[in-house]
Amino acid sequence: MFTGTIFNSLFTLPLVISQFVPPPTRPVDLWDPFKTTTTPFPHGGVNQGLNRDEVVVRLPLGDIVGKEVHLHNLPWTIHKDPTEELPKDGTHFDPNPLKPKNNITVFTFLGVPYAEPPTSQRRFKPPQQLTVFPGKQPYLAFNYAASCAQDVEKSPSPFVDHPYPFMVDEDCLYLNIFSPDISKNAQTTYPVIVFFHGGNFQTGSANEWPAHGLASRGMVVVTVNYRLGAFGFMSMGDSETGNYGLQDQRLALEFVKNNIVTFGGDPQAVTVVGHDAGAASIGFHMQSPYSRHLFRSAATMSGAEVSYHSYIGKTALAFNNTMKLGRYAGCTQAVAQHRWDCILTRSTGDIIDATRNIPIEYNRYLFMPTVDGKYLPGNPLWTLVNAPSGETSIMSPVPMLIGMNAQDGSEVVLEDRRLGEFSQFNDVDHEYLKSYSLEYCYRHNYSMNREATADAILSKYTFWPDRAAAWAIKENFIQFATDAYYTAPMQLSSHLHSSSGSRVFQYVNNYNFSRQHPNLLFIPDWMGVCRDCDLYLMFGYPFLPDELRPIGLRGINFTDTDRNASRTFSNIIRRFSYHQNPNFQFDGSWAAYEPRRHWYINFNYTHEEDWKIPGTLARDYRYQDVAFWNEYIPALVNYMTTTFSPENVAYRREIMVFKWITGVNVIIIALLIVLAGAFGYMVWGNKEDEEAAYKAENHQLVEYRDTGHSVSDATISSRTRSPRSRITNL
């Protein structure tokens, strides 16, 4: 019995120990074992001091130097938010309330490499892990690195005449770190936000989203560059090529897991936040076996992995797009591998120019994530649909925050650069709506009832009281693009994830920024709640000085209402990163999304006191319109012009097969008849020709009168006979 007790203890001891694993701690600095300074000396073997606003941390890759940035007059601190002082009963307030204005220091490390440069022999290949920081030590992380190579003219922006503010290069695998505290004597670590930017996998950059304001809320924020377009997703249709951009993101997550504790972050408390293509990327990582255990929660904004426009489901299409790129880049080799090798010799500009000139037949773009059977094991929609039955599995069914902006589709208008250059995006008329509807159907390969499908879309989004009303046409076009590209996929993703094991919280941002004169330059009246408006709120730009805002937002006059909305929305992200639940501690009214109860928060603030609650709880956001795209349009596409009742589907197939066989038989019989006629003509026609020719010879035989003469003495016509005639007469 005693032996059995020891035996049981040996097997239960590891389980007991695992329950008391200590939280991650910051590494001990051999230059400063007693944690008396943030700056280790000497670094790089040189006894060199730092400027007052510079800080250095030590990683296994080498020393890295960043900067301090001071933010002033903020209504929160890194440890407390004003909403946390509001008790549920409304009577017992915090005895140590926050001051109305607080100063916070954020530590920034910009342009930090997380992989070897994907150039030269590493071009169009999976990213390789970095072993040491490049260049002279320590590594100076003071400025943003280059954005990934892209066609900057495709970027949806109201500033069509403004040059792109960052350099672009294929050497672009860098990230930016914003931390509220890197002191080695800190007693705690902070949750981590890893942000993947949007741009439909074609454009965008982490550099466009400075995160000082979000980091000041008590989170370590990491913004990531990843390869785009052909450079990130060109594929031969196999499991060895393509999806480089997704693999870049995964390697960045591994970098965070291995190093973020040095910057004050908790590697076990990582929340991935993605916008547009970044949101779809998160859905792909949740399904990929290669991204397991790299994050504990996810927030997807204005994008979904189930959208037709987020991935290429057929490897043959990915292969064909690559071959087209080769042809347009001047590579005409007949062997596919040789053409691929030729593309690798083309410059960055050559590839961008060739991609721009290729007509797109299917989907919105040529190069996107591909279902390769490896990194993306299966079709994302099919995987989610079959997950509840156990036929497929979601590798990372983490808690999710899913949301969008009310007019996300405005980016489709902004993407049309010609529309902006020639008419300031004003020439959206009925013909524009009609042509776009038909083009939408062509891109979706709606070969059945293509025109009927386009007519259904046009009918739904036509303003029938006045078909010529310009304001109504543009408004309806934006709603069409919003529903098709954002609302319907978001609702479908929420439904499937909530059915597959994830706890889902949904929001819709209906907050309109103030519209004074300077603001109209970056958010015109017609745009409504723009595609990036929730990011402006989340990153806290209304609280930042001009020099720390994105270039397009400098000079904007944000109001107190704007700041109030930003404070509340960023606190939603803060609560979710800390607790995987966006509810405030005194208010649990934000109900989770359910498959049959589609709860969401309508985020719309017009009064300053409204910041006390996260929004208005509602149900079934635009569900009638969602059904149009997710149910009616697919059914209409599959509807045959000549149809039978549903119960006779098998009989209909037999009829179709019979028609095909009958048609083929008729064609064969007709061919046989034609061949027989031709053969008969050759046989009988030649004989008739010979007889006619013989008669035409005008032969005259003389009556035989002398029995002493032979037939050769007979008198023959004076006309000369042909050799053939002689043979015949003999």
Swiss-Prot record:
Cytoplasmic domain ranges by topology: 685-730
Signal peptide: 1-18
Main location: membrane
Disulfide topology: none
Membrane topology, record value: Single-pass type I membrane protein
PROSITE patterns per UniProt: CARBOXYLESTERASE_B_2
Tissue: Expressed in the pharynx, intestine, and in several cells in the head including dopaminergic neurons.
Subcellular location: Cell membrane
Segments traversing the membrane: 664-684
Glycosylation sites per record: N103, N320, N445, N512, N557, N564, N604
Keywords noted in UniProt: Cell membrane, Glycoprotein, Membrane, Signal, Transmembrane, Transmembrane helix
GO cellular-component term (any): plasma membrane
GO BP terms: cellular response to paraquat; negative regulation of response to oxidative stress
Domain of life from the UniProt record: Eukaryota
Extracellular side: 19-663
Similarity comment: Belongs to the type-B carboxylesterase/lipase family.
Role played: Probable neuronal cell surface protein thought to be involved in cell-cell-interactions. Confers protection against oxidative stress. Plays a role in protecting dopaminergic neurons against oxidative stress-induced neurodegeneration.
Name of the protein described by the UniProt record: Neuroligin-like protein glit-1
